Amino acid sequence: MEQDKYLTVAAITKYIEKKFEVDPYMKQVFVRGEISNLKQPASGHLYFTVKDEFAMLRSVMFHKAVQKIGFVPEDGMNVLITGRIGVFTKAGRYQFYAEHMEPDGVGALYIQLEQLKSQLEKEGLFAETHKKVLPSFPSKVAVVTSKTGAAVRDILTTIHRRMPSVEVIVYPTIVQGEKAAQKIVENIGKINQRNDIDVMIIGRGGGSLEELWAFNEEPVVRAVYDSDVPVISAVGHETDFALSDFSADVRAATPTAAAELAVPDYRDLEERLAERKYRLLAVTRQALERKERSLEQLKQHLILNGPKHQLEQQMERTDYFSERLNNAFSKQIFVKQTVFDRLNDRLHYYHPNKEIELQKEQMALRLQALEKAMKQLLKDKQQSFFRQIDALEHLSPLSLLKRGFGVTYKENMLVKSVQELEVGDNIQVKMQGGQIEALITAKEEDISGN
């Protein structure tokens, strides 16, 4: 029948599909072009168009193949793609089924490196706030590198030269190849399981991007970031950078520089110790000189205001008043004697014997009373003087010291109340027989306010 020569749409599409399947040139096709109209739904497949200035080719890459490409394709990126040509029957069009893809022009490793760097930087793995401070005086240093080569020799030689007492523990590892990243991560984990490693150095000598790639792999970068032991990354030479340099606590330009960062030079320490010893001696000498001046001032103060000086002044006053009292007493006696002599002369003149006897008796009594009064006055003055002396001695700082009390000073100033002191203050306590210095470790104020 006439109608038998007509094919269905499905049949012709199936025929074309078979043609592509049996054509050896369509089974493995190498395509170079620019990605456009890129889409990636939840399934993880990539749908895009590969084009050049003359044509375009609809393409698809399934999720399993996408996971193997190692970078993130983007619109406008020039790529090299390997795959096959087939037919999408439902849409009735041929398309390119991509199985492998890599960037064209710039190597895939560079693209992958930049994309991983951007991702990890956004996560905060390179943040300065996370970086740990290297210990000043490590006793054990771990080194993760190849057991042969210049890197390990340079590190060992430099550490031994700068600080021979530091123990270096080498964790040999392969530093390039497919298993290098896994071995590096394992060794970082072993070091963190110990509790006696102060700092670790990871790295190798210089090389190409491919040779240094293990230190760019995400597991290594994350292991360096997560390490509790401070990490110095020394990958390559000054112009070489790896992502482990950014996640490490410190980046060293070379393995030798890493060793110099890890340990101090004992000769520098000796110079610093000598300088600090000199400064300490100078400060101590100045402090002693200040204390000696303060002690001398205190001695002068005690000499001028102490009980001995006060006693000497009171004794001088007592002598002065005693002399005045004696002079007054002598003057009174002289006056009375003069009166007596006059009266005696008059008595002799008038010969009043009875009156004379009476006057003599009265005079004697008066003289006796006067002498008694003068003696009592002198005794009272002396008793008052000695009471004042006792009071002065009782109030004297030296008397208080003899009874077990102490006088407290802070920065050469007399402390009168606990409120003038704070925890951590240095104080000086003057006691019987000398002086002590103390540090306030606790403070308790009297709640009564006294």
From Swiss-Prot:
Protein EC: 3.1.11.6
Described function: Bidirectionally degrades single-stranded DNA into large acid-insoluble oligonucleotides, which are then degraded further into small acid-soluble oligonucleotides.
CDD domains attached to this UniProt entry: ExoVII_LU_OBF (cd04489)
UniProt keyword Cytoplasm present: yes
GO cellular component: cytoplasm; exodeoxyribonuclease VII complex
Subcellular location, record wording: Cytoplasm
Uppermost EC category: hydrolase
This protein's record includes keyword Nuclease: yes
Family: Belongs to the XseA family.
Oligomeric and partner information: Heterooligomer composed of large and small subunits.
MF annotations from Gene Ontology: exodeoxyribonuclease VII activity; nucleic acid binding
Organism: Listeria monocytogenes serotype 4b (strain CLIP80459)
Protein name: Exodeoxyribonuclease 7 large subunit
GN (gene name): xseA
Record field: catalytic activity: Exonucleolytic cleavage in either 5'- to 3'- or 3'- to 5'-direction to yield nucleoside 5'-phosphates
Keywords of this entry: Cytoplasm, Exonuclease, Hydrolase, Nuclease
One BP term from GO: DNA catabolic process
